[in-house]
Design a protein with these regions (language model features):
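Gram-negative bacterial Sec-dependent N-terminal signal peptides
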Residues: 1-27
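Divalent-metal (often Zn2+) His-rich catalytic cores of metallo-beta-lactamase-fold enzymes
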Residues: 34-57, 318, 328, 344-408, ...
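Conserved beta-strand hairpin/beta-sheet module of binuclear metal-dependent hydrolase folds
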Residues: 123-184, 309-313, 317-323
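Metallo-beta-lactamase
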Residues: 133, 157-158, 165-167, 182, 219, 225-300, ...
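Active-site metal-binding motif and surrounding structural segment of the metallo-beta-lactamase
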Residues: 156-157, 167-219
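Alpha-helical segment of the N-proximal tetratricopeptide repeat
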Residues: 463-495
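Feature captures hydrophobic
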Residues: 482, 488-494, 498-501, 505-507, ...
Length: 678
């Protein structure tokens, strides 16, 4: 892996159960390391599953209902054809998508390095090709990207639900269905929610001019554009770095590495775009007929995404569940970092859909996973997931109201046994441990009310004290190895983590901690948790990934970012210590869209207010928003725009130059674990 060129492409974080295109780290194809030798570990320092891990996996095999094959039957149902290829190339020349890198999952072997429940999910997500959902009417192309792309057959063309993440994968899906079923134009696109794996491929399906003219309706829930960009801008760089762990970006596709992403195999690495919709769904329930197809949209804000909607097709008795009901319990808190979601609101929206549509639906399909057929089956899945989200909320708060804290709940909360026997309620994307902590964080915050944890020492400051009191590095290593040999992995990483913080260059300690993390990763049912432990093990052994400087954000995302949001981001990127003695009042005007702002620097802080102009500004900058976008994308500068006659400065520009010089260009190159900076 270290001998390959690592390309790091940084764009603005876009939210999502996945961190889309914001930090695409790839080698020469979509799999950083060939998975050719699946019987051996890809890492020379890697370890096989221990006897304790094998015992844990066998216990899973004995306790869960593996004889229930309904999911597999549904995942196969309606299959029409698979493409002759398993790779899709990106316009840039790299491999955008490589389904074949996961073929090791199709050999029928049970891997002790993969939790059996997760392996089952990983196999289900190997669906690849064209599927019929409603005869002659609704089709899906699965396995071309992280999400599914759905084609509704209208009177004259295709109505597309969700566009995949990349232009290249979306175009490949459209070409494939047209090849198999006859060429039809795209006459409308519906985007279910504001995550990039559902809108990023839009340019592979339509021309922007046809959307802008209104020829092709592009429909999305209200708030879509705001949340498509803004949900994660403020902490985007930190999320990008953390995404390396949650999504296992550097892990080879291997039984010892990356096997799945819970809601699909992986994220494509192609050309991501964004076109502003020309029709928004604003009401709780709203009906439209497009190309002869009747639809009722159910707005579900605050569920899996801040802007999201389900759709009911009364002609077909078909319910589209967006990403609200898929083949897993979702993240309430995503490990890369994001605002905590509300499981109670999620449960209520499922319940609303159940009573409005679920009791009459013949098929339920979604943007990920596989459809469910038959009304009894549909209601069973809807009720199970409704109850799982509600139970998470209610049982955690029940415990919290009896004194269980955020630092204890992960060891207390358990899904009811009646739900554990239903595959639809397993947490491949979330986990009981981190979702339960998220609920407490949502209602009570991070503090457990113990003064000792209110303003604790930083780990690097407390670790030497622990090491001294435990008798030094040698004793910790002996005890850590003993705990490892006993299969007491959580106890082992509790003390070894202290040692690594105290001695970041202690290779033996880092290697032993990596061995511990690896076994924990093997055992975990959640793909994100598995990836996080295995990625941590890799970085402890080999250091952080290296790569070329990040590429600038794409033009579609820049256009979608409001000027106000960009100015607020500058406030975050400002190194206040470099302008501690400065005060600046700046008027900014963008005549082409009629916006104006006051930007003020004082007390090492940058603040912004929209719709105002200061009477005594130190500097007034006037330029069109379309020209400002070049500055936002770092493709030009204010000085260059002034020289070109595209911007005017009225007043003293020197304080502004000092301000811009104090803006920090964030890069996701910081350590997550001590001693891993190469």
């Amino acid at each position: 892996m270290h001998n390959k060129t690592l390309h790091l492409a940084l764009a603005i974080t876009l939210g999502s159960g996945i961190s889309p295109m914001l930090f695409a780290a790839v080698a020469n194809d979509a799999n950083p390391e060939p998975a050719a030798t699946q019987n051996s570990h890809f890492d020379s320092k890697g370890k096989a599953p221990s006897s304790y891990t094998i015992e844990a996996q066998n216990a899973v095999r004995k306790t869960l209902p593996f004889a229930d094959n309904r999911d597999f039957e549904e995942a196969r149902k309606g299959f029409i054809a698979a493409p002759s290829y398993n790779k899709i190339m990106a316009e840039a020349g790299n491999v955008a998508w490589n389904m074949g890198s996961y073929d090791f999952l199709l050999g029928g072997k049970d891997y002790d390095s993969i939790n059996p429940s997760l392996q089952r999910q990983a196999v289900l997500n190997m669906a690849f090709g064209l599927y019929e959902v409603v005869p002659e009417k609704i089709y899906q192309v699965r396995g071309f990207d992280l999400a599914n792309i759905t084609f509704i057959k209208g009177d004259t063309g295709w109505i597309v639900f969700d566009t995949l993440m990349s232009k290249e994968t979306a175009k490949a899906a459209l070409d494939f269905i047209n090849e198999k079923l006859g060429k039809r134009p795209v006459v409308a696109i519906v985007i279910s929610h504001s995550h990039a794996d559902h809108f990023g491929g839009v340019r592979g399906l339509v021309d922007e001019a046809d959307v802008r003219s209104g020829k092709i309706p592009l429909i999305a829930p209200t708030g879509f554009m705001e949340h498509a960009v803004a949900e994660n801008v403020y902490a985007g760089n930190a999320m990008t770095r953390r995404a390396f762990f949650q999504y296992g970006v550097m892990l080879p596709h291997s039984p010892y590495g990356h096997v799945d992403m819970a809601i699909g195999k992986n994220a494509s690495l192609g050309n991501m775009g964004l076109i502003e919709p020309n029709r928004y769904i604003e009401k709780d329930f709203e009906s439209l007929t497009i190309d002869g197809v009747e639809m009722e949209f159910q707005s579900t804000p605050g569920t899996e995404a801040p802007a999201e909607m389900n759709t009911w097709f009364p002609q077909f008795k078909a319910f589209w569940a967006a990403e609200n009901i898929v083949g897993t319990i979702h993240n309430i808190y995503t490990l890369r970092g994001a605002l905590v979601r509300d499981p109670l609101v999620w449960s209520k929206n499922i319940n609303n859909a159940l009573y409005r549509y679920g009791q009459q639906a013949d098929v339920m399909f979604a943007s990920h996973s596989w459809p469910r057929w038959g009304n009894e089956r549909i209601q069973d899945v809807m009720r199970a997931q409704r109850d799982a989200y509600a139970n998470l909320n209610n049982a955690v708060l029940h415990a919290a109201n009896q004194g269980v804290t955020i630092n204890e709940i992960q060891n207390v909360y358990k899904l009811p046994e009646s739900l554990k026997n239903n595959w639809a309620t397993h947490s491949y994307h979330g986990s009981e441990e981190h979702n339960s902590r998220a609920v407490i964080n949502r209602y009570l915050g991070y503090w457990d009310a113990n003064p000792a944890t209110l303003m604790p020492l930083s780990p690097k400051d407390s670790a030497p004290l622990y090491m001294e009191m435990m008798g030094g590095a040698d004793k910790i290593m002996v005890k850590g190895k003993s705990l490892f040999d006993q299969g007491k992995y959580r106890e082992a990483y509790e003390i070894l983590n202290k040692l690594v913080y105290a001695e970041p260059q202690n290779t033996q300690a880092k290697d032993l901690l990596a061995d511990v993390y690896e076994q924990v990763g093997y055992q975990k049912e959640s793909a994100g948790v598995r990836n996080s432990f295995l990625a941590a093990a890799y970085e402890l052994r080999h250091g952080m990934p290296k790569g070329v400087p990040p590429k600038p954000t794409g033009p579609d995302m820049i256009r979608a970012m409001s000027t106000e949001l960009w100015l607020e981001y500058l406030g975050i990127a400002l190194d206040g210590s470099k302008v501690a003695d400065q005060h600046l009042v700046l008027n900014l005007r963008t005549p082409d869209n009629g916006e104006q702002f006051v930007v003020e620097l004082s007390n090492s802080t940058l603040t912004t207010i929209k719709g105002q102009q200061a009477k005594k500004a130190d500097l007034t900058i006037t330029l069109d928003r379309s020209d400002l976008e070049g500055v936002m994308a770092r493709k030009t500068s204010f000085a260059q725009l002034v020289a070109a006659g595209k911007a005017t400065f009225e007043g003293d520009h020197k304080p502004f130059e000092r301000l811009m010089a104090a803006i920090t260009p964030f890069t996701p190159t910081f350590e997550l674990l001590p001693g891993t900076q190469q």
